[in-house]
Every structure is written in structure tokens, then in C-alpha cells.
A protein has these predicted regions:
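N-terminal Rossmann-fold NAD(P) dinucleotide-binding loop
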Residues: 287-288
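Aromatic pocket-lining residues of Rossmann-like dinucleotide-binding sites
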Residues: 294
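Short, positively charged and aromatic/hydrophobic N-terminal segments
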Residues: 2-12, 16, 23, 30-38
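Glycine/serine-rich phosphate-binding loop and adjoining beta1-alpha1 elements at the start
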Residues: 140, 159-274
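Structured beta-strand/loop patches that form or line metal/cofactor-binding pockets in enzymes
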Residues: 86-117
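Glycine-rich Rossmann-fold phosphate-binding loop(s) that bind the pyrophosphate
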Residues: 283
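Hydrophobic Val/Ile/Leu positions in short beta-strands of Rossmann-like dinucleotide-binding domains
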Residues: 278-280
Length: 296
């Protein structure tokens, strides 16, 4: 396998890539970065976390998005595990990188020409330590198991920061709503929910919108859920106002980003947004409303 190596000062070199390279002496005091399968992997300066990552890599071969997310989180946890050996003893880190449940299912639907199309659906229920799973449903051709696991893994930490009792999960499909008629999107969403409804519920798993899944798609899914389960419960967030949705739901993520950033600036530097240069990536709901709030 081809890879490139970069050496940086003041770190330890470790062995990767099926033991092609051996651990080197501490005298070298360098860190190895291997570009492998599209992911830059840096050696973690903690033997326990290195072993955790190696197990994750072995269980999830080729899943570069998920592996990169796990690596970044493990890297940030180095000072935590050094101060809290009890977390290591209890196997907390080993457990948090492994999903509690992974669901993959077929989604057949009929297009406007009467032809049957088949997509793949996913729901990863990653961690429910503090509450029911919570995370969006992404509809995009790039969706695969690796992407959904990466998003679900990060959702654990995002949700825990809210202070609310909600766990982390994520779902989606490789269906592309772009260029599809309303009827085609509706039939896909109904088929998707016909299977997904077996695995979600107000006290179990509460999906939401994401890329490709707006109020229209959530509405179709919610209608199918009600039809099958005969329940009008809070099983999906992101619904329209006329059937149980929340005010300012569309703007909430972008606004929240600015509020959070404002508090961080205030906490760390005792400053405000005034006079700051703001760089925003993208042009979706988050970027648009973050731009709006930042200019205010």
C-alpha cells in the first residue's frame, strides 16, 4: 500500500500499516503521519488510546470518515484518560467508539415512470447513556455506513453539550431528492419510514432533518409513521408548524452557532463579535442564518 510519511518534532513514532514499520526509539522524538486510504493518521501519544484506535480500524476497514472522526476525538481525550484512569479501567472509551446498534435496510420505491427503484437506508443508534438516541436523517448520494457512523459518533458529544438527556444517533439514505418530483420524494419517504418506524419512538430514538431532509420530507415520514403506529407523538423534530413543529426551527442551528461562538469569545477573551471578521463555509440553512445573525 502506498503512503507518505511526515516527521514532526517532539513526539513518539509508532507502528502502523500491518506492522510494516516497527516502533522506533524514543531518541528520535518524532511523530509519524501516514496517509492511508485517504486519511491522515497521526500516532496518539497514549498506548491505551492507540490500542483503541487499532481495534476500531480493524472492525471498520476502509471507513475513512468514521476512522477520522474517532481519531480526532481520541486525540482530544489524551489529557482526560491520563487524569482519569478509572475511565480506562471501566472500558468507557472502548464502549463509546462502538455503536449500540446499526440498522441497514432496503428502501424500494416507484418513480413517476412506474419503475421500481431501490436505495439503501441506515440508522446508527450510537449511544443512549444519557437518554434516547437523537440525530438527523441525511438524504444524499454520498451517504454510506462510514458517513452515518461518523455523524452519529459526533452527535453523542454535540447532544451531551446541550445539557439535555439525549443520546447520539444518525440515519439516512443514498437517495438523492434533487431532480425528483414531490410524488417520488413522498413515495421514497413513506417506504423509508415503513422500515424505520420499527426502530424509533419518542422514548427510544427521535430523528430530525439534515442535508436533503427538510420540512417536506419530515412531513411525509411523519405521516407514514402515524399511519402505521397510530400515534401522534414527538417522534420526529423539524416538522411544519401546522402539525407540531417549533417556531424558528429552520433558523435555530445557524443562530445557535453564533450564540455559542459569542459566549466562547466572551468566556475566553472577554470580547464580543464587534469588529471581528467572520468566515462562514457553505450556503445551506446553517450558513445562511449564521450569516444573518452574525451581521446583526
Amino acid at each position: 500500500m502506498k503512503f507518505c510519511i511526515l516527521l514532526l518534532a517532539n513526539c513518539k513514532i509508532v507502528c502502523y500499516n500491518k506492522k510494516v514499520m516497527c516502533g522506533m526509539s524514543k531518541k528520535s522524538r518524532a511523530q509519524i503521519i501516514i496517509y492511508k486510504m485517504g486519511v491522515l493518521i497521526m500516532a496518539l501519544n497514549n498506548a491505551y488510546l492507540e490500542s483503541v484506535y487499532e481495534k476500531v480500524e480493524k472492525r471498520n476497514p476502509g471507513e475513512k470518515e468514521f476512522l477520522q472522526a474517532v481519531y480526532e476525538v481520541l486525540e482530544s481525550l489524551i489529557p482526560v484518560v491520563e487524569k482519569r484512569p478509572d475511565l480506562v479501567e471501566a472500558g468507557i472509551i472502548d464502549r463509546i467508539v462502538e455503536p449500540e446498534r446499526q440498522i441497514i435496510f432496503r428502501v424500494p420505491w416507484v418513480d413517476d415512470n412506474g419503475k421500481v427503484q431501490v436505495n439503501r437506508g441506515f440508522r446508527v443508534q450510537f449511544n443512549s447513556a444519557i437518554g434516547p438516541y437523537k440525530g438527523g436523517i441525511r438524504l444524499h448520494p454520498s451517504v454510506c455506513a462510514s458517513v452515518i457512523k461518523f455523524l452519529g459518533f459526533e452527535q453523542i458529544f454535540k447532544n451531551s453539550l446541550t445539557g439535555l438527556p439525549i443520546g447520539g444517533g444518525k440515519g439516512g439514505s443514498d437517495f438523492d431528492p434533487k431532480g425528483k418530483s414531490d410524488g417520488e420524494v413522498m413515495r421514497f419517504c413513506q417506504s423509508f419510514m415503513t422500515e424505520l418506524c420499527k426502530h424509533i419512538g419518542a422514548d427510544t430514538d427521535v430523528p430530525a432533518g439534515d442535508i436533503g431532509t427538510g420540512a417536506r420530507e419530515i412531513g411525509y415520514m411523519f405521516g407514514q409513521y402515524k399511519r402505521i403506529r397510530n400515534e401522534f407523538t414527538g417522534v420526529l423534530t423539524g416538522k411544519g408548524l401546522s402539525y407540531g413543529g417549533s417556531l424558528a426551527r429552520t433558523e435555530a442551528t445557524g443562530y445557535g452557532l453564533c450564540y455559542y461562538t459569542s459566549e466562547m469569545i466572551k468566556c475566553m477573551k472577554n470580547e464580543t463579535f464587534a469588529g471581528k471578521t467572520v468566515v462562514i463555509s457553505g450556503s445551506g440553512n446553517v450558513a445562511i442564518y449564521a450569516t444573518q445573525k452574525a451581521t446583526e
